[in-house]
Amino acid sequence: MKIYYALILLALVMAIGLGVLHPSSQQDPEPIVVTESISKDTLTTPPDSSSTASDKILECISKEMLLGKFSPEGDTNYVVIPTYMCKYKGLYCHRVPFDAFIAMRDSARKAGVKLIITSAFRSFDDQKEIWNTKWKSSNYTSSKNEIHKIRSIMRYSSMPGTSRHHWGTELDVNSCKLAYWNSSEGKRAYQWLCNNAHKFGFYQPYTADAGRTGYAEEKWHWSYKAMSEKYFEAYIKTITAEDITGFRGSHLVDSLKVIQTYVQGVSH
């Protein structure tokens, strides 16, 4: 009998040992840790500029928003830019690009570069006021005809309903005067922006690229790419020449191919 129990005990010990050495296939395997390589762009791009965040923010882009025919007052997506960060009072900006600008401004300041906002969101009516002022200006009244006049104005100014500033994603910084950007301070600021703006989600839409059409180079104009590209895509799909009206010269939008030449004339 003792031998019998001894044999049973030996069998149990062997079974347990084999179970330890060869665990059941139903047992949960040990977790495997996978280390992914993270690109520099991922590390330096603000979290709010992710495609998911932008999709949520921009899932309801209306024609009115694309054309600037709305007011940001009372819209919780917009903020009033503090006066110490801008040249003029009462400027609005979409809060996502503005948060990114704050981070960019702080980084620039540490490098000894000053960034101040000179223009941000502009409504259709704001742009119309700029347009009408230039239309009546003596600088353009001597133009041979309306087409020549419009092309002269549109070297640096957009027709109402075609400006990227309608989207709340664009910022003009420091100065729109060429003399500033040709100064030592301006050159330093521009070089810093060229080297660092992308880290905060911004890029220059109007460059000196030879293949680009439309407006002249604007070193002061910086666009929040993750959002503005979605507005751009929506604009091209939604807006036609018939939608751009209500100001002097608007009857020539189609013949001048304003959407193709100017709205689409950006660097990406």
Where do the protein language model's features map onto the residues?
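Extracytoplasmic cell-surface/polysaccharide-interacting catalytic and binding patches
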Residues: 11-120, 124-268
